């Protein structure tokens, strides 16, 4: 998380640095220019808005400098300074006051005035829009004597623009007025030659014939015979624009007043990861603003990127200004996760798997799988669209000895023309995910957490040479057919814990003088599994771990031996069963292991199914009764993906007892199925995406979920899924 924040900070610093460098370049470019040079430069096409703004401001500053240089000696040395002051135009007087050449006689008066004239209501199309009662003009008090050149914009019922100004008969014949459709236009940037003489030979009103476009800012200005801006009146744009669309569907853009939009105005869709778009040229699709009735369904498919819609106004000369910009669409989390795949006949032939949301990936998106973290997009790796939700690295022996490998999702930013890192994930993120989110989870009941679980958790050592165990006596098939369906995990219990798995299904039988984990065949020793758990819990004392011992093929002496081994190795980390199924995460601090000991399903013990149903008299209180967990499943019925999914869906809305609950997303083998030439790994890979869709539906509809148990648990993005659900549910509850 700290790395992501560091990346964002660096990006913001880079943007600010680029902005400062651009500003310096513009200043250097125009530092020695005259007013004439600058005005000429304004007429050159394809200038960016920041450059236009700088030039306009520079012209204004140079004009002010000339005025100050002209009048300062006259007013400071002349005996006729009062006469000179009276002859100075209001605009020049304002500049001299600003530069402390003249005193401001109206300094106690508010610097702006507000029109209360009836023209503050705009009438067009038979409708009236009342502007705010305090609609300001840009007139200054010092510019507003009794005969002020107060200019206004009027919109007629047929949606045409008139310009009105006061007391024309008192003004110079060479004064003039003009109409502009954006605020920062140079003096000669008026609309379609709509400038008019405004002096003593006019009526103070002109009908421009220009259609009012509510999507543009409209401005009228009054200039004196020296081309000095005296007053102006602005009607702000009423333009807005919106972009939306479901993931995988065409993006839809809406905007108002399309019928009066300029025929050369453009609606554009942008993909920008670094703030509002700045240039029409970087858009990914366009349409004309006066088309599509203001409702445009683009051919661009929503791939979950930060899309913007922008209304670009044509200001002539091939130049455009941004009239309105939508809020960005929130980028869709690709649900990037890291897993580990087993390939081949031994568990040391391993690939790193990068899982991600397979819906609507952009053609340019790609995934990198690396043994170290990357800070910049590298050589494009696996195409995200083609890979359809999962990429597997090439086999790499280094993956067996480390969790420090990364998946990196890269997308393209059209605004900058570069790839950027959209999301990163590392297997180490799951190592202590409960501890990392402890403040959010400590008050949650364990039965209300969503937890990854592994089915027949310690079967990673099963191979074609493994001896058959007592639970396989009813199968009368060769070992080479049965072993591929008996191995359900490829990672050790310690590595599963590091991958974020928190529920373990453990079955036990004796072989010679040792107790082993079994599933049709003998796998790793119980002692080694307990040592794996001890190693992990010693490093992570707040990570909730649920051990479910069941299907115990043990005589009474072995049953007691197993309980003794568990207590001796893990005892100090085991919580007391009197805490019950309502136990909260915080209640397990320091003793995070819930050890459920189900010795009823035991055909060899007097206390099990083969005996009198009575348990041993002595039972440690740290061994939880199996009544604290529910794990519904019918092994005789679910032998295909369709039947399993139907069962799982049927259980979603069944009221659940207030105990731990297991969702068994697993297959039970039945030889009526065509198993020859198949194995459980192949079946899991074939149906993995369908199970993921089911899990995603549980998330979408916030269906109550506790433990999700699967075969080959690292083949699924379950840990990141559970982290997301637990933290999101916490955020929603707050």
Curated annotation (Swiss-Prot):
Pfam families: PI-PLC-X. It comes from the Eukaryota. Keywords: Coiled coil. GO terms for molecular function: phosphoric diester hydrolase activity. Residues 440-604 form the PI-PLC X-box domain. InterPro entries: PI-PLC_domain (IPR051057), PLC-like_Pdiesterase_TIM-brl (IPR017946), PLCXD1/2/3 (IPR042158), PLipase_C_PInositol-sp_X_dom (IPR000909). One of its GO terms (biological process) is lipid metabolic process. CDD domains: PI-PLCXD1c. Residues 8-70 form a coiled coil. This is PI-PLC X-box domain-containing protein DDB_G0293730.
